[in-house]
Swiss-Prot record:
Protein name per UniProt: CTP synthase
CDD domains, sorted: CTPS_N (cd03113), GATase1_CTP_Synthase (cd01746)
Sites where the protein binds ATP: 15-20, 72, 239-241
NCBIfam families, per database record: PRK05380.1, PyrG
Keyword tags: ATP-binding, Glutamine amidotransferase, Ligase, Magnesium, Metal-binding, Nucleotide-binding, Pyrimidine biosynthesis
Length: 546
């Protein structure tokens, strides 16, 4: 199979939405019957985002094969059916690490290692490998043209443009076309300078995606075409919209997919965007609203919980309700108590690391349990629910996780190296001292308890979900917790690890050690999120009847 490559760059400012634009184009091409994949090339020196602060970088998206990647890969999976893997995201740090490892082994036979050709060759190899087996590979270059960090990536795609030829490569550049209120017009000069910068390093864009808060007038598009040496039909206006799921139709209406298909001489059907039209209709026509309180640690940056936010919206689509997310700092719960949890239709506690705010999350789980409020715990959200139950129901007053209190008399949650075996002996397992790459990662099979809410949600006796954690439920306390009424509704493939818990006599109190948000999509939703939002809606209706 001959793969065609579309390289997506950005200019003027960051956060223009390259990932959304790339994913939207991929969705249109997929709707035309093409096999499409998307890659993200990140210019930072970190090997991967696994140890980066969520408040700086946003969430870490975990792929099926366990790669810790950029959150843009979440957008990719939500827009197209192709599943991402570790070949779809790599960083400058990863490239340098691999090149230096080869140099230490002597693979370069004593040559002087340089950015060109050694680093650029390594980048090209990864791009070509990532595109194998697909009709079209869209490659997003992180950062902004002009950044010193991006230069090796830009040089690499310039070389690929020459080596593969125009019939296999296309360069798409996103720029900002701002509107100046004082002048009453849009300004094209930033776009002209951005394209000039790109051309100075040898890349001539074939398509310009012009971002702005309004549609670009025809005369300004003609002006951009003239000064940037791009066909007028290839100057695409991409205005702000109230839903990112409207963007595929917006790009298609301007013929972007047809331009790509003709450039690559591809034979394929017309795009069928009916699934996306259905998503847009559901989003615009809810039959009600629910308020979900998300009790977390990183709420100052919503992107830290990007996939959770989107999964809640998807569940709203499936339940025909609008989901309003109320972000609640878990430290605020610690300081003010449950008064900040009033008026909610459901509580969700997402994943996280570190001790800060954990008692607030435990209080949130207690509030939901005692008030029959729908509760959904994800990763740490499951662990705090278990800790709360152990303390206040099972009689283990000082129960905790060894992540937060190594001296706890009831370590109901322990590090993966601290598991207790079936005879009650502490089993120490080896763990590298580095934080990066030492977690349980990727898709894992989970067996579901027959008749449980989890099994009802999945409509089956098993599921496959993605993990990202170092701590597990300590099996030493499993029997005692079960006797107190906790239901262990999900177990690992070998049935030795607890994957899900729930409460029997509660409208909807379900938690999982995994991250179901990573597999939710606007077209398909996710069973657990759908069940949670349905329970929140039912809770609201019960309150209204009182």
């Amino acid at each position: 199979m001959t793969t065609r490559y579309i390289f997506v760059t950005g200019g003027v400012v960051s956060s223009l939405g390259k990932g959304i634009a790339a994913a939207s184009l991929a969705a249109i091409l997929e709707a035309r019957g093409l096999n499409v994949t998307i890659m993200k090339l990140d210019p930072y020196i970190n090997v991967d985002p696994g140890t980066m602060s969520p408040t700086q970088h946003g969430e870490v998206f975990v792929t099926e094969d366990g790669a810790e990647t950029d959150l843009d890969l979440g957008h990719y999976e939500r827009f197209i059916r192709t599943k991402m893997n570790r070949r779809n995201n790599f960083t400058t740090g990863r490239i340098y690490e691999e090149v230096l490892r080869k140099e230490r082994r002597g693979d370069y036979l004593g040559a002087t290692i340089q950015v060109i050709p050694h680093i650029t060759n390594a980048i090209k190899e990864k791009v070509l490998a990532g595109g194998e087996g697909h009709d079209v590979a869209i490659v997003e270059i992180g950062g902004t043209v002009g950044d010193i960090e991006s230069l090796p990536f830009l040089e690499s795609i310039r070389q690929l443009g020459v080596e593969l030829g125009r019939d296999r490569t296309l360069f798409m550049h996103l720029t900002l076309v701002p509107f100046l209120g004082a002048a009453g017009e849009v300004k094209t000069k930033p776009t002209q300078h951005s394209v000039k910068e790109l051309r100075s390093i040898g890349i001539a864009p074939d398509v310009l995606i012009c971002r702005g808060d309004r549609a670009i007038p025809a005369n300004e598009r003609a002006k951009i075409s003239l000064f940037c040496n791009v066909e007028e039909r290839a100057v695409i206006s991409l205005k702000d919209v109230d839903s990112i799921y409207k963007i595929p139709a917006l790009l298609r209406s301007q013929g972007l997919d047809e331009l790509v298909v003709k450039r690559f001489s591809l034979t394929c059907r017309e795009a069928d965007l009916s699934e996306w039209e259905n998503v847009i209709y559901q989003e615009a026509n809810p039959n009600g609203e629910v308020v979900i309180g998300m009790v977390g640690k990183y709420i100052e940056l919503p992107d830290a919980y990007k996939s959770v936010n989107e999964a809640l919206k998807h569940a709203g689509l499936k339940n025909r309700v609008s989901v309003t997310i109320k972000y609640i700092d878990s430290q605020t719960v610690e300081a003010k108590g449950d008064e900040v949890l009033q008026g909610l239709d459901g509580i969700l506690v997402p994943g996280g690391f570190g001790e800060r705010g954990v008692e607030g999350k435990i209080l949130a789980a207690k509030f939901a349990r005692e008030n029959n409020l729908p509760y959904f715990g994800i990763c740490l959200g499951m662990q705090v629910a278990l800790i709360e139950f152990a303390r206040n129901v099972a009689g283990m007053a000082d129960a905790h996780s060894t992540e937060f209190n190594k001296a706890t008399p009831f370590p109901v949650v322990g590090l993966i190296t601290e598991w207790v075996d079936e005879e009650g002996n502490v089993e120490q397992r080896h763990e590298a001292s580095d934080l990066g790459g030492t977690m349980r990662l990727g898709a894992q099979l989970c067996h579901l308890l027959e008749g449980s809410k989890a099994a009802q949600a999945y409509k089956g006796n098993s599921c496959v979900e993605r993990h990202r954690h170092r701590y597990e439920v300590n099996n030493k306390y499993k029997e005692r917790l079960e006797q107190a009424g906790l239901v262990f509704s999900g177990l690992s493939s070998d049935r030795k690890l607890v994957e899900m818990i729930e409460l029997k006599d509660h409208p909807w109190f379900v938690a999982g050690q995994f991250h179901p948000e990573f597999t939710s999509t606007p077209r398909d939703g996710h069973p657990l999120f759908e069940g949670f939002v349905a329970a929140a809606s039912a809770h609201q209706k019960r309150d209204l009847k009182k």
